Amino acid sequence: MKKVIIVLAVMFIVGIGCKKTIDPGGGPCACSPISNVYFSLSVKSSNGSDLLNAANPGAYSKDQIQLYYKDAQGVLKSVDFSIRPPFSTPKTTYAFNQLFSNTLAEIARSGNHIFFLKLGDRQPMELNVKVVGTKTERLLIDQVEVPLEPATAGDELYLKSIFSLKL
């Protein structure tokens, strides 16, 4: 009987300690891993093809992409990024590669909001990134707001935070 009471007490304490907020993107609970801030951008052609997929004509490889910012002294510094492949979860399938960077989001959160993205031989584009907490809230490219990928209420949180650039 004592074992049953102890097990119930432990379950009660764990249940109280691990309550998650209903708001998606809310803070981590006591048991979950801490989430990092990130920046994610898909790049598409005017006809909707993935320009980060090397198999598509006119696409850019990671070597053809430069992401950088100017520090307080005006020195250009590169920003680490990766190309994430398409993904699928039980609720969502996303068929596009994404330019992904934790570093860009951390720098933007610390106060420097202006970055530059150079794709192949194109002119560098100015990115103005607004980060609030652990979410990239807004992206302007050359002073034009870039929309988030269309998502529904049941979609994964990550999908709801991918910006979609059409060239």
Language-model-detected regions and their locations in the chain:
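Tryptophan-paired
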Residues: A54-L119
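Detector for glycine-centered tight turns/loop "hinges" at secondary-structure junctions
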Residues: N47-D50, A72-G74, R122, Q143
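Glycine-rich, aromatic-bearing surface loops/beta-hairpins
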Residues: Q123-L167
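Short amphipathic, basic-aromatic surface patches that mediate peripheral association
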Residues: P28, V43-G58
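Charged, amphipathic alpha-helical segments
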Residues: T21-G25, S45-G48, T92-T103
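Bacterial Sec-dependent N-terminal signal peptides
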Residues: K2-V7, M11-Y38
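Extracellular Ig-like/FN3 beta-sandwich strand-entry sites
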Residues: N36, R109-I114, R122, T136
